Curated annotation (Swiss-Prot):
<dbReference type="InterPro" id="IPR029061">
    <property type="entry name" value="THDP-binding"/>
</dbReference>
<comment type="function">
    <text>Catalyzes the transfer of a two-carbon ketol group from a ketose donor to an aldose acceptor, via a covalent intermediate with the cofactor thiamine pyrophosphate.</text>
</comment>
<dbReference type="InterPro" id="IPR020826">
    <property type="entry name" value="Transketolase_BS"/>
</dbReference>
<dbReference type="InterPro" id="IPR005475">
    <property type="entry name" value="Transketolase-like_Pyr-bd"/>
</dbReference>
<dbReference type="GO" id="GO:0005829">
    <property type="term" value="C:cytosol"/>
</dbReference>
<feature type="binding site">
    <location>
        <position position="188"/>
    </location>
    <ligand>
        <name>Mg(2+)</name>
    </ligand>
</feature>
<dbReference type="GO" id="GO:0019253">
    <property type="term" value="P:reductive pentose-phosphate cycle"/>
</dbReference>
<dbReference type="Pfam" id="PF02779">
    <property type="entry name" value="Transket_pyr"/>
</dbReference>
<feature type="binding site">
    <location>
        <begin position="115"/>
        <end position="117"/>
    </location>
    <ligand>
        <name>thiamine diphosphate</name>
    </ligand>
</feature>
<dbReference type="InterPro" id="IPR049557">
    <property type="entry name" value="Transketolase_CS"/>
</dbReference>
<keyword id="KW-0460">Magnesium</keyword>
<keyword id="KW-0106">Calcium</keyword>
<feature type="binding site">
    <location>
        <position position="186"/>
    </location>
    <ligand>
        <name>Mg(2+)</name>
    </ligand>
</feature>
<dbReference type="InterPro" id="IPR055152">
    <property type="entry name" value="Transketolase-like_C_2"/>
</dbReference>
<dbReference type="InterPro" id="IPR033247">
    <property type="entry name" value="Transketolase_fam"/>
</dbReference>
<feature type="binding site">
    <location>
        <position position="186"/>
    </location>
    <ligand>
        <name>thiamine diphosphate</name>
    </ligand>
</feature>
<feature type="binding site">
    <location>
        <position position="356"/>
    </location>
    <ligand>
        <name>substrate</name>
    </ligand>
</feature>
């Protein structure tokens, strides 16, 4: 089945990777040299993917979880017709389409941003979950409209990371059939021999999770690799194929050592390696025409045929199931139904509720009117109010179910919804306590880097949690999340702000959102609907102002906004001019015009106080050098929530005291 031309193609891919790294004088040649045979076999014999039709919905997804091996992926994208050779010559250079680690939406053919080890593996689980759910929802007899595989190339480092354990456990429990991991098992890590740090039995580990395990003893045996992938595709549940490889294969002096992991070979070793491959070291970035032809006649031909057949199936599906087809097409587009927001609840002045509870009510409506809405909680659904009532749970028997039981696997949960968002067809969300956002912070960061429409629900947002004490009371988390570029961090002050926050989350196509919600009840602010709508979308707005000459600004978010209003009303009775500003979303406020910012925070009013039950970090930008921040510079305490709030100075009396001191 395989011949000398296949070997030439593999060695060409190795050589392209080596040359890109040598020209950049930076990169990781070891993985591309060792893993090229498995990647080549997958792409030419199995992968249903045409880089020139990168948005085809039913394509297979290929994720290079070992993102440091990016030169391999770029070489594959070039020989398959997606990436210009000039881009390989600009590897790791400013403005190129070949950055050091693969970047989503930057290079056609890159499904997700990888590099932080383990996250690609976990995002792949999310992609397989998306495929399973959408298939369960839309497929009908004779119409497997969603039917594709998720393939992962993972390294030893990926499998050492804790997130791989969480994600593998989840995938095994849910028996995600179309998830296949190719494990580049080369017994070397960056620092040296793998047995110095990693000695577990991969077979026993993954079989304990409920995975299938296949061993390929020779990573250069194309038939053995091909047979393993074929076997994996026929099995129930996820499969890991451990492929024993030699890192830096072909390098006479560096193969099998950590010296080839993360540094260029050097000119002398490059020449020796090319001779081992039977290639001319005088030729750089050389691709024989036969190599291009192999990819045209295998991968691209297969992908084009599959896409044409699928398009015909979709046409027939649309005739047989017109309503379902329209829903499916809307899901593929990533758009929201028209007027979905009209179905969301509005709250009057008689309403008092925790923003987590208001969010829970909104979730019920979103699930009803936004069919692509899908997610779950890390074993805190009852507390986060994140489950869809009366809906089925997602599992292997009811993949169409809407409630995902992520279990106590916060990091894997965060990465999984990123994978779902990148997959497409869904508006995914995940929920946990705000203090546990630390467990999934790297996934938040990666969602922002990728510009995904992921929504993270974080409840129990402050010291008002009370009895659970400092381990469960967030302090530094708000500042940490606000520091992430391209992240909506929205802390709503009441039910109406929560409603608009959800609208912002779903409509922010290229920005993830963290919703920071209370456990305790909040009264409804006396502000008209349009003001709230515009104000939350702009990040900050005026919720109360006295008629007197403006003298003081009180800034707050979340539960402290009403406290600020109470203090302002007291100051009003004393004849003071006060404005209260709700600032639910700093990120959005920073994007507003200087004129809008000045209209909210007039520069000639310097007596300012910010009030927030969290670290004061960041607030001084808004209160200025003469202003004050009523925040928290220590950890919380265990006691009834109202008492903790009082002891930490979040009272009307303390606000008035601080105002008088200005």
């Amino acid at each position: 089945m395989f011949n000398e031309k296949d070997q030439l193609a593999i060695d060409t891919i190795r050589a392209l990777s080596i040359d890109a790294i040598e020209k950049a004088n930076s990169g990781h040649p070891g993985l591309p040299m060792g893993a090229a045979p498995m990647a080549y076999t997958l792409w030419t014999r199995h992968l249903n993917f045409n880089p020139q039709s990168k948005d085809f919905f039913n394509r297979d997804r290929f994720i290079l979880s070992a993102g440091h091996g990016s030169a391999l992926l770029y070489s594959l994208l070039h020989v398959s017709g997606s990436l210009e050779l000039e881009e390989l010559k600009q590897f790791r250079q400013w403005g190129s389409k070949t950055p050091g680690h693969p970047e989503y939406r930057h290079t056609d053919g890159v499904e997700v941003t990888t590099g932080p080890l383990g996250q690609g593996f976990a995002m792949s689980v999310g992609m397989a979950l998306a495929e399973s759910h959408l298939a369960g929802k839309f497929n009908k007899d004779q119409f497997d409209i969603v039917n594709h595989y998720t393939y992962v190339l993972a390294s030893d480092g990926d499998l050492m990371e804790g997130i791989s354990h969480e994600a593998a456990s989840f995938a095994g429990h849910n028996q995600l059939d179309k998830l296949i991991v190719l494990y580049d098992s080369n017994d070397i890590s960056l620092d040296g021999d793998l047995d110095k740090s990693f000695s577990e039995d991969t077979k026993q580990r993954f079989e304990a999770y409920g995975w299938n395990y296949i061993l390929v003893e020779n990573g250069n045996d194309l038939d053995e690799i091909d047979n393993a992938i074929t076997q994996a595709k026929s099995q129930q549940g996820p499969t890991i194929i451990e492929v024993k490889t030699i890192i830096g294969f072909g390098s006479p002096n560096k193969a099998g050592s950590n010296g080839v992991h993360g540094a260029p070979l050097g000119e002398e070793e490059r020449a020796l390696t090319f001779k081992e491959y039977g290639l001319d070291p005088e030729k750089r970035f050389n691709v024989p025409e036969d190599v291009y032809e192999i990819f045209k006649s295998t991968m691209l031909k297969r992908a084009n045929e599959n896409e044409e057949a699928w398009n015909n199936m979709l046409k027939n599906y649309s005739e047989a199931y017109p309503e379902l087809a329209e829903e499916f097409k809307l899901a593929m587009s990533g758009k929201l139904p028209n007027n979905y927001a009209d179905a969301l609840p509005e709250y009057d002045l008689n309403h008092s509720g925790a923003s987590r509870a208001d969010s829970g009510e909104i979730i019920q409506k979103l699930s009803e009117f936004v069919p692509s809405f899908f997610g779950g909680s890390a074993d805190l659904a009852g507390s986060n109010k994140s489950n869809v009532k009366e809906a089925k749970d997602y599992n292997k028997d009811t993949p169409e179910g809407k409630n995902v039981w992520f279990g106590v696997r916060e990091f894997a949960m965060g990465a999984a919804i990123n994978g779902m968002a990148a997959h497409g067809g869904l508006h995914p969300y995940a929920a946990t306590f705000f203090v546990f956002s630390d467990y999934l912070k790297p996934a938040l960061r990666l969602s922002s880097i990728m510009g995904l429409n992921s929504t993270f629900i974080f409840t129990h947002d402050s010291i008002a949690v009370g009895e659970d004490g400092p381990t469960h009371e967030p302090i530094e988390q708000l500042a940490g999340l606000r520091a992430i570029p391209n992240m909506n961090v929205i802390r709503p002050a009441d039910g109406n702000e929560t409603r608009v926050a959800w609208e912002v989350a779903l409509e922010s196509e290229h920005t993830p959102t963290s919703l920071v919600l209370t456990r305790q009840n909040l009264p409804t602010l006396d502000v008209d609907k349009q003001t709230v709508e515009n104000g939350v979308r702009k990040g900050a707005y005026i919720v109360f102002e006295t008629e007197q000459q403006l003298e003081y600004l009180l800034l707050a978010s979340g539960s402290e906004v009403n406290l600020a209003v109470e203090a302002a009303k007291e100051l009003e009775q004393q004849g003071k001019g006060v404005r209260v500003i709700s600032m639910p979303n700093w990120y959005a406020f920073e994007q507003q015009s200087s004129e809008y910012k000045e209209s909210i925070l007039p520069s000639d009013v310097t007596k300012r106080i910010a009030i927030e039950m969290a670290s004061p970090l960041g607030w001084h930008k808004y209160v200025g050098i003469e202003g004050k921040v009523i925040g928290i510079n220590s950890f919380g305490a265990s006691a009834p929530g109202d008492l903790v709030v009082e002891k930490y100075g979040f009272t009307k009396e303390n606000i008035l005291k601080q105002v008088r001191s200005l």
